[in-house]
Amino acid sequence: MPRSDNLYEIPNNVPVPVADGACNHLTGMRLPSVALRSTSGRLVDLAGLSGRVVIYCYPRTGRPDVDPPQGWNEIPGARGCTPQACAFRDHHQELQELGAQVFGLSAQDTDYQREAVARLHLPFELLSDSELELANRLRLPIFEIGGMRLIKRLTLIARGGQIEKVFYPVFPPDKNANVMSYLLCRPPDVLRRSRQRNDQYLKGNEWP
């Protein structure tokens, strides 16, 4: 039976999450070493990844045949996980060109996440923190509904296992312009050196 609303759209009247300071402690922290199961079938330890990593945390993706939990749309920041995933999908190539790996992370189990990856054609892996081990060690903001404990929506940018930027709260959920702008202003070293060489070349070959 199809759900009674459009999973792929964000209603106009959803409440806006407030900046409550719940993530103020994260910038500069080291990611803890936690083996997270991926939708690709492997274990991923975010702390051990080199380079820049974008980790977008989300409460839970819905399904087209199941209505959301009662009261879901009334929770600030809860609605919009599917549009958020699609936005990262649509900008994935650009993020890769900026030197970033992308992962989605939620408290849902891997089988549930795999359905979303297949249905939404996501080109990146989703990671399951079903025991909230990573969330608890980082003291990420959590909320409860229908017997579920879920991670609030936020985005972490890490480099070499250390958190360098936090976006929280994230609203609207499908707008990742802040992430793109941040990465564009801080290109990876290889792109930075290339730009510097281009600038030097142009200075040495100016029109008379």
PLM regions with names:
Residues 1-208:
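Chalcogenol-based redox active-site neighborhoods
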